[in-house]
């Protein structure tokens, strides 16, 4: 196996999945390192996408070619337009998703993306050389090298 990539993304949450997908779509040989492939883009106890603030972010991600909105459409179990009693400028779409389906759909997207590879293991440390990040070392000592490392280690670290 070749352990050299253009970009390594550490963390398989929402940001990590979007970053890895975008990098690979732009032609970079990309590695996504995650602690658990069955929990890619895991949603919190309130599995909602959209709403007043988050809805704006989802629309911006969508405009940039991201997949969060599409994955939401594939895994949604209920949809509601918030603030319908106010003017149209205040309306805000929100979807409740099936938590497992959301993660499964993200995995399908990532596994079907060319130039994107997924490695399940804990990232332990950055490899530094010549005052520059050169890669990532995992908990079992596997060393991956790259031109850039994106850290999206998020909040679900337990």
Label every model-predicted segment.
Residues 2-5, 139-148:
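Core beta-strand elements of the Rossmann-like FAD/NAD(P) dinucleotide-binding domain
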Residues 131-136:
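Short, hydrophobic/aromatic-rich segments at coil-to-beta transitions
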Residues 2-15:
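Beta1/beta-strand and adjacent pyrophosphate-binding region of the FAD-binding site
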């Amino acid at each position: 196996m070749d352990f050299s990539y253009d970009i390594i993304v550490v963390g398989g949450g929402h940001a990590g999945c979007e970053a890895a997908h975008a990098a690979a779509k732009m032609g970079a040989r990309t590695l996504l390192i995650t602690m658990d492939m069955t929990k890619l883009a895991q949603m919190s106890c309130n599995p909602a996408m959209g709403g007043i603030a988050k809805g704006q972010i989802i629309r911006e991600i969508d405009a940039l070619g991201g997949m969060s909105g599409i994955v939401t459409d594939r895994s949604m179990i209920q949809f509601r337009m918030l603030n319908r009693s106010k003017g149209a400028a205040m309306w805000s779409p929100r979807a409740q998703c099936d938590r497992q389906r959301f993660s499964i759909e993200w995995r399908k997207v990532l596994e079907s993306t060319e130039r994107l590879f997924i490695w399940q293991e804990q990232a332990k440390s950055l490899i530094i050389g010549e005052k520059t990040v050169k890669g990532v070392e995992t908990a079992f000592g596997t060393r991956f090298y790259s031109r850039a490392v994106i850290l999206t280690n998020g909040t679900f670290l337990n």
